[in-house]
Regions:
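Aromatic/basic micro-patches that form nucleic-acid/chromatin recognition or nuclease catalytic surfaces
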Residues: 61-95
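Short coil/turn linker and secondary-structure boundary residues
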Residues: 8, 12, 79-82, 105
């Protein structure tokens, strides 16, 4: 999947870069609604995994000072995706859902499942490597 900075369309998968290794994902509905598996803005400082849930914010809150990128799907990906209206419906049905786990149930899993009907995260291996290097003191 390719990612570009452009105007979002209802049901698009959207991401922002958090740091060099990780991105944050959500489902774009409009500039006033992005549904994401994230931390409530009022709880960001000192928040734990237990505080993370599916919530709705606007695009400015979601982008947190960075530029949002929207998924530009190949023909094959477009054929596999759930239609945009149903994508938004699925995302909204999960508002308030918890159970966040950075490896097994993260924001990318959430967005991908809403768009394609199955969980997937390209970041799993990055997160595993980051956790391993932090635990062993490696800085690679």
């Amino acid at each position: 999947m390719k990612w570009t900075v452009r105007e979002g369309k209802k049901g698009d998968m959207v991401r922002v870069h958090c740091n060099e290794q990780l991105d944050h994902y959500g489902v774009y509905v409009s500039d006033t609604e992005v549904i994401q598996f994230g931390k409530n803005p009022s709880l960001r400082i000192g928040a734990t995994e237990a505080d993370v849930c599916v919530l709705s914010t606007d695009i400015n809150e979601f982008r947190n000072g960075t530029y949002p990128e929207f998924a530009d799907m190949s023909f094959s990906e477009k054929m596999k995706r759930i239609n945009p209206e149903k994508t938004v419906k699925l995302a909204r049905e999960r508002l308030g859902e918890g159970g966040y786990n950075i490896i097994h149930n993260n924001c990318e899993h959430f967005a991908y499942e809403c768009v394609f009907g199955k969980k997937y995260s390209s970041q799993e291996e990055k997160v595993r490597a980051l956790i391993k290097s932090t635990a062993t003191g490696n800085k690679n």
